[in-house]
Amino acid sequence: MHRGGDRSTDPSSGPAPGSRGGGDGRFGRGPSRWSSGGGGGGSGSPPHRFSRGGGGGGGDGGGGGGGGGRFHPYRGPSDHSGGGGYRSGGGGEYGEPGSGPRHRYGSGRGDHSDHDNRNNYVKLFIGSVPRTATEDDVRPLFEEHGDVVEVALIKDRKTGEQQGCCFVKYATSEEAERAIRALHNQYTLPGAMGPIQVRYADGERERHGAIEHKLFVASLNKQATAKEIEEIFAPYGHVEDVYIMKDGMRQSRGCGFVKFSSREPALAAMSALSGNYVMRGCEQPLIIRFADPKRPRPGESRGGPAFGGPGFSPRSDAALVIRPTANLDEPRGRHMPPDSWHPSSPRSAPHQFNNFGSDNPMAPKGSTVTSTTDTATFRPQMFSGNGSLSSQTAVPSSSHMGMNPPPMAQGHHLGGQQIPPLQKLPGLPQNFPVQLQNNQQGQPLQGPAQQIGQLQVPQSMGPGSFGQNMLSGQLPVSQPLMQQNASVGAVQAPSAVSNSMQAIPGQQHLPSNVAPQMLQQPVQQMPSQAPQLLLQQQAALQSSYQSSQQAIYQLQQQLQLMQQQQQSNLNHQQPTQGQPVQSSNPGAPNAIIPSNINTIPQQATSPAVPLTCNWTEHTSPEGFKYYYNSITRESKWDKPEEYVLYEQQQQQQQQQKLLLLQQHQQKLAMQQLQSPPQAQTHPAMQPVQQIPQAQQGQQQMQMKQQELNYTQLQTPGAIDPSRIQQGIQSAQERAWKS
């Protein structure tokens, strides 16, 4: 086709001096970015933005001006008048240039003055356009189906490179519909990897009052093709389009859109298939809702003068994605790219929610689904309307929180008070001391601190208390180990540690009887300050439990070694002192302490729980965990109680194995460090009458025994204090890290 115009112009209708009027379409493009011809008019007359014809004045009628342009079959006869078959510009009904009123977008467009109103055009998005394509490659293809007002190739603002897509403006919606039906997924431009996608651009259907009967379909098989999906919905009516949503790796998300020609077949398909039809290879039935048209977010403009700014979208309601904010009810965000076109910087995030819940094809059946005829809402049961966790819903376990937390849960409401996520205690039912778990099952806590041979274990004992005493080389021995009233047999060190409350900032100690009451109260009925206080105490107990338990075992081992050394030293001192030494008491700890160690694993036991569990833990493609029952085929977001008890039993078994291993190691160490046999058999040879005399000299022996406690650690054959300190430090470090 001839692009040039007739260069002959009528002087009477020519442009005013200084204007850009006149010339043909090739050299007169100055006034408009997209025009292919010069706009006419006087010096003050703005040229038509979309004009392709040349010519002088701003009129629409025929004249003698040179008119650049091209022929296509959808223009009326008036478009071809003048200039030997080419579109005319020139004077027209408004008279000579510079006189009379001027039309805002006047140009040589023949009788299509209604097309010049930029509010009447219809904008289409074209995907899978080669990055090397030009306007001349795109325009002729679309002009075969209607009057193309404008073609705009989208380029990157920084680099200037094309983004592989463009926009095409048609004069009427009928022409746009005709182009969509003829070209969508049916024509491949030269150099493209696949067929082009032709769809309405953002908000075009709503702007022109058109209604799309489109369904959103979730729980699709990720290997299913558009043809297979169409076959499922075809029995209910004519399917115009099937769109499968894909991620950045070009893999199906398990959801998509099915477009019907009318509302009745769409409603029939939704009623028959939603919640009933299960695709081959899937475990969950299809979830079908009417697609909710995208609404722009507040503060986001739809674009600049021609086609909109950088926030353009390939389709009007392609993805219905909500950005990860704290409120699930705020307007929808931008869309996902189409299935065959991806921009250089994908906007899709790995964890996003649409208004039907997460893009999870394995959405559990237990989820609550509520819908209307126009919009649909699908949220897991654990989320309330405002994005906060429901008060009747269990907090996800630490294994769930180990990943990125759900983006919509910025804070958790606990008893009417919002607690930040950082103060939330992860994994409390699993890692809390065994004694507190038993207390919840009906066993009372034992509050007072116990004494290991008058070796006091303070109630606020934690990692710091052991470190301050042991690292300084001072053993916390307040009374002699030889006293007869030492309650060694009643040792319950883990219980004392679990009941002890770590000192809160400000050195606020709680009585031992307060802890069970606070732990047994429902979380919703706590005072306003109690939740934070309890969380801090529980966190301190968790961190100190492991280190305290290891330190107690080390102290018991040191106690046995010191008793054995005291026996050997007392045997050497008997000839010099001239009076017998009590012999029955020193042997008592040797028989009691091993029994204490044997009772510790028994305390760690809990009521029997079945070793098998029908619930299993799984992770959805979005990273959220759910639980599936292999017997009832039920899925839940919340962790079932049976699974919680099963995990607790597994952890208790691991703790028992650890305690047995430590006990075995201690026995081996004791066998290696035991004194000669006469040190154990000698007390039985002492007469009974010597016991009162030994009690009379008890005060003298106390001072000597305390000296031995501090000096015998440095004697040959004793434990090196540096090794003790290193062991305690390593135990504390492991406890803090865990």
Curated annotation (Swiss-Prot):
Q: Spans of biased composition, class Basic and acidic residues?
A: 109-118
The cross-references to SMART domains, in alphabetical order and at most eight, read: RRM (SM00360), WW (SM00456)
Q: Where is the composition biased (Low complexity)?
A: 368-377, 435-451, 683-706
* Tree of life domain: Eukaryota
Q: Does the keyword Isomerase apply?
A: no
Q: Which parts form a coiled-coil structure per UniProt? A: none
Comp. bias intervals (Gly residues): 52-70, 81-98, 301-311
**Which residues does UniProt assign to the signal peptide?**
none
Gene Ontology cellular component annotations, sorted alphabetically = nucleus; ribonucleoprotein complex
| Summary of the function given for this chain in its UniProt record | Plays a major role in the promotion of the transition of the vegetative meristem to reproductive development. Required for RNA-mediated chromatin silencing of a range of loci in the genome. Cotranscriptionally recognizes aberrant RNA and marks it for silencing. Controls alternative cleavage and polyadenylation on pre-mRNAs and antisense RNAs. Regulates flowering time, seed size and cell volume, probably via the modulation of cell size.
Instruction: Please name the GO terms that the record assigns under molecular function.
Output: RNA binding
Residue limits of the RRM domain? Answer: 122-203, 213-293
What single Pfam family name could you report for this chain, choosing any that match? RRM_1
The chain's disulfide connectivity reads none
The WW domain covers 609-642
Residues that span the membrane, as ranges: none
Protein name per its UniProtKB record: Flowering time control protein FCA
Matching entries from Gene3D superfamilies are given as: 2.20.70.10, 3.30.70.330
Q: Where in the cell is it found?
A: Nucleus
Where is the region Disordered?
A: 1-118, 292-451, 566-595, 670-738
**Keywords associated with the record:** Developmental protein, Differentiation, Flowering, Nucleus, Repeat, RNA-binding
List the source organism.
Oryza sativa subsp. indica
